[in-house]
């Protein structure tokens, strides 16, 4: 039977509960335990797939096709495990399941209520998810006191009775703010947040205090006194130069040891963090840097392309260079000098997205990178716009476009997938999850991967139109990767260009700090060569 670590948050959102959960997972896994992590989001959406990236950040897609909160990306990167649909729980998913069961008569005419039906459904999912784990870490989204989160908090309170108090740890992430006027840290918000938790019957074992200034022992003792925890259970976490430093900070303060003791697990020895030491050391002490232009539709929201940026950092660590990301709003390029906006960059990356806004700016950036020999990497929509740009400006297909942006295009080089034609619902209906792809020998893609059979994650409705494949290939574009069994073009590249590759998939979702994605690693290698005056490969 699994033991459980529940991570809640108080005072304000965005304190780093996901990073805390991932860091705890890292420390426990490095001690040899089987660990998994679940995110429980209190919103009524069934999943994150239809949510606005400006509000919610990126959608993280799992191998099994679940569209989830970006925190699952943190979890996968920190514990280096492949997660799935069962690792993402939302209010919408729970209520949909319970209402469906009620309609089928599963409750035998009983009155269906939040307690016990909703809370039991939540608990049953946690128990199932923990069946093959030593420790299941569960992050509850939002903050204590939010009305939406009450059923989840009640469910995790009841879990202590269900599995035994000795098998449960409650870790509360809270804020200790610095008041500039008073020139001091304030503990009252943390006290009130813990009081709110205690009001519903949850007594936290550990407090993770986010603060911008050092906390002295007197302050930790004060928090411990008013919140009824040992002073050593008051953990200070300040902003780090890289999120991959957080496990070291938590370990130095004994967080992993306290969790193991509370759960009755062996806590002798030290976690093997040698690979993480190498990552952080190479990140912090990189002697050189490259600059990559990220030309996207949602760059104003720092989390909209979170996995892309992390994958670039991973590739930089692999090569021992810092990667500086220049965020370029594609819509602004439509009325700006593209050359001036991209001046001095060592590579251009065009990420995914949806809709017509900013598309011509993307196409302008693609043309500039192609003509100037700048390493160019397109992901999903980025790959599609690379095809559009090449069709227009090299193959003389005037008006070539994607049916998504121009349904009446004379040359729809990107078109709606056949199986999408009769779909009238938006959520969960795209081509989602991992699919196999065969690579052509002797291509850039094959060299990057080092194998001819790969699997990557997808999230799209539109695809390369094979009616134009012969003409585009005759014009010099090369198809180097095709989905096995259905002839769907997955990768295009341009022989003779320093580095030019577009993939229909989202390789960034599988990148790890200790194991960068092959395409990102080779892309940054090409950027380094350009920086130092060499060719891209």
Q: Predicted segment positions?
A:
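C-terminal and late-domain segments of enzyme folds
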Residues: 432, 440-537
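Flexible phosphate-sensing "switch/lid" loops adjacent to ATP/NTP-binding sites
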Residues: 1-324, 330-347, 354-355, 362-368, ...
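Short beta-alpha connecting loops at secondary-structure transitions
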Residues: 55-63, 240-244, 350, 371-377, ...
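Active-site proximal loops enriched in glycine and acidic residues that flank catalytic Cys/His/Asp
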Residues: 9, 39, 211, 238, ...
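Acidic/polar loop patches that form or flank catalytic/metal-binding clefts of enzymes
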Residues: 206, 268-271, 377-378, 388, ...
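Glycine-rich, charge-decorated loop segments at or immediately adjacent to ligand/cofactor-binding or catalytic sites
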Residues: 179-186, 384-393, 494
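Cysteine-nucleophile active-site neighborhood
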Residues: 15-18, 22-26, 30, 341-436, ...
């Amino acid at each position: 039977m699994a033991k459980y670590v529940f991570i809640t948050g108080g005072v304000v959102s965005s304190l780093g509960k996901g990073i805390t959960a991932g860091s705890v997972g890292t420390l426990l896994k490095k001690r040899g335990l089987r660990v998994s992590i679940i995110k429980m989001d209190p919103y009524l959406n069934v999943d994150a797939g239809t949510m606005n990236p400006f509000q919610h950040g990126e959608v993280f897609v799992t191998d099994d096709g679940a569209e989830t909160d970006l925190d699952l990306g943190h979890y996968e990167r920190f514990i280096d495990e492949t997660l799935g649909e069962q690792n993402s729980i939302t209010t919408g998913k729970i209520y949909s399941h319970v209402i469906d069961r009620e309609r089928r008569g599963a409750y035998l005419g009983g009155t269906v209520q939040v307690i016990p039906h909703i809370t039991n459904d939540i608990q049953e999912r946690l128990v199932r998810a923990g069946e093959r784990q030593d420790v299941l870490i569960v992050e509850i989204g939002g903050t204590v006191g939010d009305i939406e989160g009450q059923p989840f908090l009640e469910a995790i309170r009841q879990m202590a009775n269900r599995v035994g108090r000795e098998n449960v740890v409650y870790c509360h992430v809270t804020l200790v703010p610095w008041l500039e006027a008073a020139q001091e840290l304030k503990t009252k918000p943390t006290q009130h947040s813990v009081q709110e938790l205690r009001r519903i019957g949850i007594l936290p074992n550990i407090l993770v205090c986010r603060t911008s200034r050092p906390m002295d022992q007197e302050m930790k003792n004060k928090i411990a006194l008013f919140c009824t925890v040992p002073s050593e259970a008051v953990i200070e976490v300040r902003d780090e130069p890289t999120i991959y430093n957080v496990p070291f900070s938590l370990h130095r303060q004994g967080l992993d040891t306290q969790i193991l003791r509370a759960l009755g697990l062996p806590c002798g020895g030290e976690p093997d963090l040698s690979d993480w030491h190498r990552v952080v050391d190479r990140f912090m002490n990189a002697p050189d840097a490259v600059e990559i232009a990220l030309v996207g539709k949602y760059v104003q929201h720092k989390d909209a392309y979170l996995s892309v940026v992390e994958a670039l950092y991973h590739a930089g660590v692999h090569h021992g260079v810092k990667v500086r990301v220049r965020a370029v709003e594609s819509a602004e390029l439509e009325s700006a000098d593209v050359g001036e906006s991209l001046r001095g960059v060592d590579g251009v990356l065009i990420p995914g997205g949806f809709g017509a806004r900013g598309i011509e700016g993307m196409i302008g950036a693609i043309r500039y990178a192609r003509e100037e020999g700048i390493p160019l990497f397109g992901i999903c929509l980025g790959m599609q716009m690379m095809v559009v740009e090449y069709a227009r400006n090299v193959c003389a297909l005037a008006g070539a476009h994607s049916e998504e942006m121009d349904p009446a295009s004379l040359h729809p080089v990107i078109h709606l997938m056949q199986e999408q034609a009769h779909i009238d619902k938006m959520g969960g209906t795209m081509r989602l999850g991992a699919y196999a792809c065969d690579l052509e020998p002797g291509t850039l893609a094959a060299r990057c991967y080092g194998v001819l059979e790969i699997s990557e994650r997808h999230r799209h409705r539109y695809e390369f139109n094979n009616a134009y494949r012969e003409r585009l290939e005759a014009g010099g574009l090369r198809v180097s990767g095709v989905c096995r069994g259905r002839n769907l073009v997955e990768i295009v590249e341009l022989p003779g260009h320093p580095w030019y590759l577009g993939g229909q998939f989202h390789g960034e979702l599988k990148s790890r700090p200790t194991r960068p994605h092959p395409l990102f690693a080779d892309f940054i290698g090409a950027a380094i060569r350009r920086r130092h005056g060499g060719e891209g490969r």
